[in-house]
Swiss-Prot record:
The lineage of its organism: Bacteria, Pseudomonadati, Pseudomonadota, Gammaproteobacteria, Enterobacterales. This is N-succinylglutamate 5-semialdehyde dehydrogenase. GO terms for biological process: arginine catabolic process to glutamate; arginine catabolic process to succinate. PANTHER family: ALDEHYDE DEHYDROGENASE-RELATED. The active site is at E243, C277. It comes from the Bacteria. Its EC number is 1.2.1.71. Belongs to the aldehyde dehydrogenase family. AstD subfamily.
Amino acid sequence: MTLWINGDWITGQGERRRKTNPVSAEILWQGNDANAAQVAEACQAARAAFPRWARQPFAARQAIVEKFAALLEAHKAELTEVIARETGKPRWEAATEVTAMINKIAISIKAYHARTGAQKSELVDGAATLRHRPHGVLAVFGPYNFPGHLPNGHIVPALLAGNTLIFKPSELTPWTGETVIKLWERAGLPAGVLNLVQGGRETGQALSSLDDLDGLLFTGSASTGYQLHRQLSGQPEKILALEMGGNNPLIIEDAANIDAAVHLTLQSAFITAGQRCTCARRLLVKQGAQGDAFLARLVDVAGRLQPGRWDDDPQPFIGGLISAQAAQHVMEAWRQREALGGRTLLAPRKVKEGTSLLTPGIIELTGVADVPDEEVFGPLLNVWRYAHFDEAIRLANNTRFGLSCGLVSTDRAQFEQLLLEARAGIVNWNKPLTGAASTAPFGGVGASGNHRPSAWYAADYCAWPMASLESPELTLPATLSPGLDFSRREAV
């Protein structure tokens, strides 16, 4: 029984699915997808639970969310292992994901009050008050790269605001989704407030097609995000949050400290085996001897990265990709770029056929035409050389995406110029592209998403503002508008 609907664990009536470890092929989870009728049942349960949940005092909702945080802390080792085994990422990195989930609770409580709390201004004859109200029933679509942390970034703010939810994890990480929901169950959520439906494309389409849905919070690929945007067009009554991918540029203008610049680049491009939406995909390196030395050192150090199993000792920097198919897609993207005229600096290599273990690849594409503007979700870094900083900014902005951008330089003026001209929601200076603060907004422009549906601004998508002019009693104004006569006439 792998679906949780209206407080009950039930068996899916859809396609049979099993999840294996992407490196060892060990079977980790088996279950059936939710069919369309079960998705509708989950929505009905959420709708029925909404009025009572929304009317709960905020403190009551907060108490349940904080109980969930305590359960995360108590079961940190267990959840870390589930995430690591299911995604293929090393244990150390999975542990940081669970820590981020725990930290998200206090941050979301602060964000609720800062972004969507109540404000009151006294007027001469009353008060003007701003309040926020939950949307109602929201769907949450989770990704596979951070199957605990990223859905958590929508679920927690949405529950705090008083919404009820239907959560569909990625079909590639059902085990993590189920494990997290069991902790929510133990935290004491009332029946129907949070519902779990497992499944792939058909389940997702059934969920996004529901008429009785007040909104959808999505994290995933641009192609799926665009599909959802088209599907919900003409329905302004539904809130849609899209957190999508990026084709992110990292500009190496001044690499005087070569090893520090190489370390920053490795952290930007290859952490999580390149499976972060903020990962550097395009490396822009200034022409000249310093840039040559930087690239040579980058290829040298990156070539020593050996992906390993989640529980290897010592731990590897990167583990496997989410699937062998994902690793194959990266290999095909590299070969495509070679066929276009790219010059391979470091060839990616499958460590073992049939697994998702893949070494990093680096390919130079300076002067190559018709390079696809796409997010290759894995450890493949594309290099361009440039002559001057204005050209670097032009290259950086030459994409339909706009998530993250970074600069390695000692010149503050160059960073200020980049801040003004970059088309990106995150612009870092001498910091990895993959570094982001949960106390700041997270998201991008263009094909990277709409507004900032994650991190500090996630609360904005979970409640709508209600403005009120109010007074405890009704009185006649001392001064009337022109043309109004309230004088009492003598009876004749």
